Amino acid sequence: MPVILGLETSCDETSASVLSGSGDAVTLDSLVILSQDVHRVFGGVVPELASRAHLTSIVPVAERAMADASISLGEIDCVAVTSGPGLVGALLVGVSFGKAIAHGTGSALVGVHHMEGHLFATSLEHPDAVPPFTALLVSGGHTLLIDVEQWGSYRMLGATRDDAAGEAFDKVAKLLGLPYPGGRPIE
């Protein structure tokens, strides 16, 4: 069964997952490092600081995810890495690291669209969620209403024009004197 190392650095969280299998994939390990403490003083994500946090976190996150999954670098068949949308500097860290691992190990490299990743993640927890369906994607700077006709075939029904829902939560929380990020305190 193929072993996949997944990397995500689109905004302020650095994460790595190790999956095995085809069809019904099994997550062997998943690890996320948050950089919210870095951004809290500013009341929101500062792109340059997010990129720097990824630089210091990406290697330990990937190493620990592989170690916890009892997988060595040589066992990785494919590296799947978020290729966008997201913060340019943050994406560069993840894509560069993913390319280096793929090149060094001879593994395949697959770019993953951040929002499509959210759609697919739904099927991990809800295997009965099969297209066609309509999805509301709310992730950081994105709020989209998507018609999922089949996997890989989507039609955008609507999106916000300015602030996404996540940004609105953070701004309202700041006005109310609540901590960053604002989603949980407001909920």
Spans of model-derived segments:
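N-terminal beta-alpha supersecondary unit
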Residues: 2-85, 92, 114, 118
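Active-site nucleophile and cofactor-binding loops and adjacent substrate-binding regions
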Residues: 82, 93, 109-116, 136-138, ...
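Short, acidic/small-residue loops that bind anionic groups at enzyme active sites
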Residues: 98-119, 158, 162
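Conserved phosphate-binding catalytic cores of ATP/NTP-utilizing and phosphoryl-transfer enzymes
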Residues: 1, 111-134
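Phosphate-handling active-site elements
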Residues: 70-73, 104-111, 130-131, 180
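Short Gly/Thr/Asp-enriched flexible loops that form oxyanion-binding sites at enzyme active sites
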Residues: 81-105, 124
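A short helix-loop
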Residues: 2, 9-10, 17-25, 29-31, ...
